[in-house]
Amino acid sequence: FFLALYFIGLGTSNIRDGWFFEAEVGKKVLRRRLRRGMPLVLAAIIPRVTLQKINDALELGEGETASEIYDRSKENAEPNLEMFIHVTKDGFGAIGHVDICYKGRIISFGNYDTNSERLFGMMGDGVLFSADREKYIEFCKRENHKTLLGYGLALSPEQLAAVDKEIAKLMSLTVPWDPPKTVKPKRPGIDKEEPMYAYKLKQEADGRLYKFTSSKFKTYFVMSTNCVLLADTIVGAAGTDILSVRGFISPGTYQGYLDKEFERPHSLVVTKRVYQ
């Protein structure tokens, strides 16, 4: 019964897109609409499934590199903002991570202060960081063996102004944070000191880190105030669809949305790239 209701809702959403498609050709409006996505359990595996498809294609010799297999671009595409979906083959990284790149700098959010972690890392101080794009991509591939799926968006001047305003608003709620070199051992004198990921990010990717003094992002929680919500808060200022009314958006949900938007001829998403 509930599955039937879901597919009815999904069909209604797609029909709605068709009705309004012609009216939106060539337009990049700032109005946000509710978009119904696939069930969360299915959406969660999208990044990992995509990675597997790329790796399988490489093994079958369908291309010499992952880029030859995956990369696509619309005609005359000139993206001015990127969204990255991170994915690893194993572990929690298979669920994915989301950040954006704007004006040559990565903007990301997460529980990067390991010393503040609670609930097995599901909660902690919310940390926003900015990093050099090229250095960050190489850092992610080297440090975590990640594959990054990049989606280029072509925004209008009005949309870029809205994004600038939202970033400035978020930054006004933060103060700089200087991460320690190592994580505090849980059992001093027994446990070995481990390097702090945030410190390495600062040193190797020109990272600039910040903590929130107020706002919902002051505390990171994997099921609500997570990396996807921060990215959606910024990009949503440009008028992208609302993907959840419940507050939780998984990286896979966002990737599914970006993939679908890329297939639309006149959408904001104009390129797809893989970095492996």
Where are these regions (language model features)?
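Non-catalytic ligand/cofactor/substrate-binding and regulatory segments of enzyme domains
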Residues: 1, 9-222, 258-276
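Active-site nucleophilic cysteine motif
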Residues: 94-95, 217-251
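Polar, surface-exposed loop/tail segments
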Residues: 245-264
